[in-house]
Amino acid sequence: MDISNPSEEHTMLREMVRDWTQEFVEPQALEYDREEKFNLPLLREMGEMGLLGISAPEQYGGAGLDATACAIVHEELSASDPGFALAYLAHSMLFVNNLAINGTEEQKKRILPLVCSGEWIGAMAMSEPDVGTDVLGLSTTAVQQDDGTWKINGRKMWITNGCLDE
């Protein structure tokens, strides 16, 4: 894609997201930033617009759009509220896109519709004290137990979007 000559679909997406961002994201940005709050209902509204699963296949509730479309949404959100844009990025790319590419078929069918709609919010626990975000150096392990639950051993510095969902 020639970024200086976007497709009609990309142009329409940019206009839609820019208009929505200016009307709904920008007016709340300063207040939410100063009060260290997050506008979860606003993020969920993006699910109704088809943006939370922008790169996920349509069969799982996503929009099935390309990387350029993802970049357009991130760019437009970042212009008004970088913190909100980061939460969107963590949800849509670190969680949804990762699951769409690497998840099992069962996981995709069970989880993707919920995160694409905004009913669930995706998170990512990657950073560790000894290696930062070097994914090849991560030491945390997850082992499924006999009862079907998972035992997780390791240390994380934070979980991006971990405190957003109810």
Report each predicted region and the residues it spans.
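Intrinsic disorder at enzyme termini
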Residues: 1-9
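A non-catalytic, amphipathic alpha-helix used as a structural packing/dimerization or gating element
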Residues: 9-23
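Glycine-rich flavin
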Residues: 19, 25-166
